[in-house]
Amino acid sequence: MSKKEEKTKVRLPRGFVDRTSAQLHALETMIAQIHEVYESYGFEALETPIFEYTDVLGKFLPDSDRPNAGVFSLQDEDEQWMSLRYDLTAPLARYFAENFEILPKPYRSYRSGFVFRNEKPGPGRFRQFMQLDADIVGSSTVAADAEICMMAADSLERLGIQRHDYVIRLSNRKILDGVLELIGLQGDEQAEKRLTILRAIDKFDKFGMEGVRLLLGKGRLDESGDFTKGAGLSQQESEPILSLISVGAETAEATLDNLKNIVGHTIRGLEGIHELEEMQTIFSKNGYQDRIKIDPSVVRGLDYYTGPVFEAELLFDVLNEEGQKVVFGSVGGGGRYDGLVARFRDEAVPATGFSVGVSRLMAALHNLGKCPVKKTVGPVVVLMMDKDPEYVAYYQKMVMQLRHAGIRSELYLGAAGIKAQMKYADRRHAPCVVIQGASERQEGKVQIKDLIEGARLSAEIKDNQTWRESRPAQIMVDENQLVQAVQEILVAHQFL
């Protein structure tokens, strides 16, 4: 006896998910709404490949301990390393540099697509996820940063998120640079330590002031026993940084005054403060002063930011996995990155942009009851009552008539009998089925069964004999009335 062939085990790679039709529709609807806002600001769509040469992407990910610096990579036939993009910003920098001579400057573009990170997966943390970005490349004025912030606010409101439910938090990397200058951490030789400090501050929302203090010092031991090595700063060196992230006040003016007291005597820090003041004037003149808040604790975790940085934060409570109320938190962020395009050119190219975390934003809309869910309805199903080729062609003609009238429909193409076909139509969420056997064909008639109305009536009729005799929600019409009859059923259920 031959050995039974072993079947391949069905499994999904960790960190990846499948998406259903309903999820995809909700996602497409949300993205289309955001695109409308981006288009209204004069941005145009761009698509770049999911693969780029590894050296083009650069090494900017925070998870540097993972293989290949946190990216998925392979070699092509020329033995050049290529990697799946980890964000949409690095590919934009490559595209702009490659098409520098023909693109308008400043260049406004938006992109949406999947990005990939070779990171340890966990709850809510995936290796493939979608981002939605908008950037202005070629503008050095902070008016561009201000416009990006205002556009982020408008995008959230376009999705139905109310003003009291969100805030755009804003700061400037130059202010942090001023603090680091005060404690002697300027210069290329201190770059790695500055990056560790940056990522420690970026954990403020998650770990609080004490957690940041530990990460600035020797390190932090979490509840699971994992130890994260810190920046190794002394208490004296840590204090100016801790003061910086805690000086936020009720008004922008008060916060800016507090910042001047900390870094106002450094050239870099004062430059960052003046940029925030200029942006605040733009917000006030355009009615955004209550939606965009200066918050010095915002730094962003990637090290290519060079100026204003911002995050979109949702302020309402949700239940976490332990059933505790927590603030939903960030659903996107961005900032100025004047050095990224310059990697490819001799001249500096200023740029600023914003990235939406699509999955988190979709979860937020679901919690608010604003997730754009289409009323579930499948296609009208024409049943296969006779499998003779001549009759199959006849059934297909019915389907084509419905499709030409704009009605989503399909011909059942399985091998099952009438009972199983009806069950199939139920599983497809069909609003109705079209039935034509030999007797109906001879009379030039078709039966149409309204499955939605039938389900409702079946709950009211308890007697099987009454059910069979009444044949609820089932009508007989002439063949030439098929389209009209189906349309009337769809209109009655508000599907047309």
UniProtKB/Swiss-Prot annotation:
What is the catalytic activity of this protein?
A: tRNA(His) + L-histidine + ATP = L-histidyl-tRNA(His) + AMP + diphosphate + H(+)
Signal peptide segment = none
**Entry's SUPFAM superfamilies?**
Class II aaRS ABD-related (SSF52954), Class II aaRS and biotin synthetases (SSF55681)
Q: Which Pfam families match?
A: HGTP_anticodon (PF03129), tRNA-synt_His (PF13393)
Keyword Nucleotide-binding in the entry? The reply is yes
Q: InterPro entries from the entry?
A: aa-tRNA-synth_II (IPR006195), aa-tRNA-synth_II/BPL/LPL (IPR045864), Anticodon-bd (IPR004154), Anticodon-bd_dom_sf (IPR036621), His-tRNA-ligase (IPR015807), HisRS-like_core (IPR041715), HisRS/HisZ (IPR004516), HisRS_anticodon (IPR033656)
- Provide the primary localization: cytoplasm
Q: What Gene Ontology molecular function terms does this protein carry?
A: ATP binding; histidine-tRNA ligase activity
Entry GO CC: cytoplasm
Its BP terms in the Gene Ontology are:
histidyl-tRNA aminoacylation
Q: What is its EC number?
A: 6.1.1.21
Localization in the cell? Cytoplasm
**Where on the tree of life does the source sit, at the highest rank?**
Bacteria
Annotated keywords: Aminoacyl-tRNA synthetase, ATP-binding, Cytoplasm, Ligase, Nucleotide-binding, Protein biosynthesis
Subunit-structure text: Homodimer.
**NCBIfam families found in the cross-reference section:** hisS (TIGR00442)
Q: Which family does it belong to?
A: Belongs to the class-II aminoacyl-tRNA synthetase family.
UniProt protein name:
Histidine--tRNA ligase
Species: Bartonella bacilliformis (strain ATCC 35685 / KC583 / Herrer 020/F12,63)
The organism's lineage is: Bacteria, Pseudomonadati, Pseudomonadota, Alphaproteobacteria, Hyphomicrobiales
